[in-house]
From Swiss-Prot:
Belongs to the acetyltransferase family. AANAT subfamily. Present with 8680 molecules/cell in log phase SD medium. Acetylates spermine and probably also other polyamines such as putrescine or spermidine. May regulate the levels of polyamines on chromosomal DNA, which would modify chromatin structure and affect transcription or replication. Also able to acetylate arylalkylamines such as tryptamine and serotonin in vitro. It is found in: Cytoplasm. One of its GO terms (molecular function) is aralkylamine N-acetyltransferase activity. The keyword Transferase applies. Gene3D superfamilies: 3.40.630.30. The lineage of its organism: Eukaryota, Fungi, Dikarya, Ascomycota, Saccharomycotina. It comes from Saccharomyces cerevisiae (strain ATCC 204508 / S288c) (Baker's yeast). Residues 12-179 form the N-acetyltransferase domain. The keyword Transferase applies. It comes from the Eukaryota. It is an enzyme of class 2 (transferase). This is Polyamine N-acetyltransferase 1. Its EC number is 2.3.1.-.
Amino acid sequence: MASSSSTLPLHMYIRPLIIEDLKQILNLESQGFPPNERASEEIISFRLINCPELCSGLFIREIEGKEVKKETLIGHIMGTKIPHEYITIESMGKLQVESSNHIGIHSVVIKPEYQKKNLATLLLTDYIQKLSNQEIGNKIVLIAHEPLIPFYERVGFKIIAENTNVAKDKNFAEQKWIDMERELIKEEYDN
């Protein structure tokens, strides 16, 4: 049986997301999240403009000769610096607190046809390593549904508690959300 890595797309790379990626980001959000959990165009634009260093995309390049013909976004992570030690309804909006040491991840998504190939692990590990080395903050926090907890634990996140703040919002009250965190330690990725 062939391993999933043998079917990885060619010419993959990770780079910071920019405002010119907005259309592809919106498309990916619509494929990865139910309508009530998607970030709006306004919020995504805010994040791309105010904290692009916290927004990473996994792309496939279509190359002809030495020329790049097209870049296709197949995964992304979007975050902001948040004022609390956990995700709140407020922090999921248009909020970036530059002086904060807490980075809130608001979305991790891989295009459906590229799932189950460890690409989310690749993207998230790269994200954690970059933030650790750049000393942008000292902790990453996120909220997750219970089925995703083992995935986040594999890349070093720990369960903190059930998030009761987001449950107060009608868009998020239908399911249980779990607060998770991961320390950013520069020495962890030193060579």
